[in-house]
Amino acid sequence: MASQNTEQEYEAKLAPSVGGEPTSGGPSGSSPDPNPDSSEVLDRHEDQAMSQDPGSQDNSPPEDRNQRVVNVEDNHNLFRLSFPRKLWTIVEEDTFKSVSWNDDGDAVIIDKDLFQREVLQRKGAERIFKTDSLTSFIRQLNLYGFCKTRPSNSPGNKKMMIYCNSNFQRDKPRLLENIQRKDALRNTAQQATRVPTPKRKNLVATRRSLRIYHINARKEAIKMCQQGAPSVQGPSGTQSFRRSGMWSKKSATRHPLGNGPPQEPNGPSWEGTSGNVTFTSSATTWMEGTGILSSLVYSDNGSVMSLYNICYYALLASLSVMSPNEPSDDEEE
């Protein structure tokens, strides 16, 4: 019975009160609480916990958010860089544990599995490289001139990769400008081989200049022929003149002198090549009739030559006036 009474009294103490007064179970003053401070201490701890939780939630997120914003901006700027500069930046930073420099600082050591999880599997704004495959990443290393090496003093570890490049060194970012993709070098080489196009233009211009040179040379040859025609005709005319003079001398010795007037030829003989012979023959006949030829031949042969020269040059002057395409009298007949 005593135990039942004590249990009822304990339940009455734990029951909630309405309006600040306890429910059934006896007056409050009849059964005092043996531990009056225990409930208050518990309530205070709960209140402190509730007061600390909102404060901690309000104070911690701004720092985390700012740090995340900074990381997102850094990753975004890092994504815009070239492949060698991206790799050099993450190797220089201590936050990435999957990549590091060797002791000499001229090669990069990559942990395959950790690098796959830490770097290549980044998504969204935190992404660094365009590819998420380790095979594609290794292909990029080869395209930019990185060579795979193995340390001689340690056994081969399949999880570790070591790549080196003469322009990829620790604390030397300026050397990164010398690293170029092999495709770009190939394109520049192809452009260098395509340079001979201007030579074709030069060849075309040379052919044209040769053709112009031949045309000009032909014109100059024609001019020289035209200028040299009188000199060529001169000796021939002189020869014909000499022949005609000799013939006239022979005719003067053969035929006696007469006093008849000079006779005109049957047809016009002042044009063409036949004019020389006709003119000389008529002049000879006229001089034979007047008796001038005999005196000239026997007295002074030089005066006869001068007379024939005058007649010859007069004939050449008259013939030069004619056009070369004008037909002669013989052709018309």
Swiss-Prot record:
It is found in: Nucleus. One of its GO terms (molecular function) is sequence-specific DNA binding. InterPro entries: HSF_DNA-bd, WH-like_DNA-bd_sf, WH_DNA-bd_sf. The keyword Nucleus applies. One of its GO terms (cellular component) is chromatin. SMART domains: HSF (SM00415). It comes from the Eukaryota. Its main location: nucleus. Keywords: DNA-binding, Nucleus, Transcription, Transcription regulation. Residues 49-60, 228-242 have a biased composition (Polar residues). Residues 79-182 bind DNA. Residues 29-39 have a biased composition (Low complexity). Residues 1-66, 227-275 are annotated as: Disordered. Belongs to the HSF family. This is Heat shock transcription factor, X-linked member 3. The gene is HSFX3.
